[in-house]
Amino acid sequence: MAKQIKFSDDARKSMVEGINKLSDTVKVTLGPKGRNVVLDKEYGAPLITNDGVSIAREIELEDEYENMGAQLVKEVATKTNDVAGDGTTTATLLAQAIIREGLKNLAAGANPIVLQKGIKKAVEKSVEAIKARSHSVTTKEEIANVGSVSAADETIGKLIAEAMEKVGNNGVITVEESKSMGTTLNVVEGMEFDRGYVSPYMVSDSDKMVAAMEDPFILVTDRKITNIQDILPLLEQVVQQGKPLFIIAEDVEGEALATLVLNKIRGTFNCVAVKAPGFGDRRKEMLEDICILTGAQLITEDLGIELKDASFDMLGRARKVNVSKDKTTIVDGNGDQSKIEERINQIQNRIPETDSEYDREKLQERLAKLSGGVAVIEVGAATETELKERKLRIEDALAATRAAVEEGIVAGGGTILLDIIEEVEKLVDDVEGDEKTGVKIILKALEEPVKQIAINAGIDGSVIVENVKNKDKGIGFDAYKGEYVDMLKAGIVDPTKVTLSALQNAASVASLLLTTEAAVVTIKKDEPAMPQPGPGAYM
């Protein structure tokens, strides 16, 4: 395929066009008075949202160079969303500001590599300063504040805080669509793990692609099931009981899988199988957790039990099991409560003894799954369009709240970025030339979030920025009420993790674009139109 190449300013200008188109679309959603964006969908109703990453993902531009720029900024939003779950609009806005200021200086003859060095130093200093001003989240009220600011809805913040109070900060919280108009919180004892059905033919709801089982028997083994004869005696006994069977195994394949699927399709019996969660030794421990929770016996050759020798009383029970393509939730297992508590104590005792951060994290995960249960936020609305928009906001708010619990909070509304300007300015005297210019680019970009929040509220952004800079640290502009307040006391806060991710990802992609000297795209060939059939062609 032939390629087209553009160089230096020509290449950068074309890409910046795309960056501006994407960023200008996303930044109108920032702040308490931010607007929504309507996204056309190929099927169904349009989606109305103020979620930065959802908007960015939808944007594809016709011009290849513009699209290349848009995709780079889309990467900023996506990466920030993956790491922190929120802050995507701020990240996009910061990237646009750094690129805009950087290009002005490149046009004036600045060296892009030295400029990049200055940007990097300023970001490192900013990260240090933000971390120093971070406050840990301890109370239910603080957790509610984070959720309220993220979702721009106080009731959502309170709902998330309540969910975290009931299942613990590391507990499993899911967001689902409700059949009613209201948004409610339900807490059920249960366990969730990241494994889905081994065959899509096992689903019970083909629209949502989920398999739901009421009151199933549960078979747990660390072996691979390939021969149906190994589990036939158990299957027959389960069928006689008229209940579904849920299988957790290393894998289910070959003849065994074909037989289970065929019988499911014919309606002979309902069976869903998933692969065992985890790997290596951790897998065995997780299977033991599931057994204790459901009252099952782990069928493993390590204990001298083979699949064909397994008896009916080795099966566990649960009130409900839901399986999607990548997730399984076991609700209300039939395990002995004293054994569950004993297992919880074992895991709690192991956490302080573990040196590895990763192992500690996994132990805490297991602990949450055994002790916390599952909190389900059921989202209701008058129309499907409103429901989707509300669900997205709650998912963002939940991610922001988790990030706040993990790494703390800072003054919200972009205030923290203005508060650290004084400290970052100290770098200006330590560097010179284009490196100094790089530092100044970040100083200018740090003003953007406050400015844009004010603009979206219909106020002159530059005036607000200067006013906040002249006030005490922590005093920011509440765009909703139109007054200056102590942001932490007013409950207008942002998770530290979200702010850091937004700044770091924006600077990373922006500085790479500034060092770009050529852009290469594929030349699209115009496909010839299909020839029209002549007379009598269909006779």
Curated annotation (Swiss-Prot):
Domain of life: Bacteria
Reaction catalyzed: ATP + H2O + a folded polypeptide = ADP + phosphate + an unfolded polypeptide
One Pfam family cited in the UniProt record for this chain: Cpn60_TCP1
Keyword Chaperone set for record: yes
GO terms of molecular function: ATP binding; ATP-dependent protein folding chaperone; isomerase activity; unfolded protein binding
Annotated EC: 5.6.1.7
Enzyme class: isomerase
TM region(s), chain numbering: none
Assembly: Forms a cylinder of 14 subunits composed of two heptameric rings stacked back-to-back. Interacts with the co-chaperonin GroES.
Role, per record: Together with its co-chaperonin GroES, plays an essential role in assisting protein folding. The GroEL-GroES system forms a nano-cage that allows encapsulation of the non-native substrate proteins and provides a physical environment optimized to promote and accelerate protein folding.
Full protein name: Chaperonin GroEL
Record organism: Finegoldia magna (strain ATCC 29328 / DSM 20472 / WAL 2508)
Gene transcribed to yield this protein: groEL
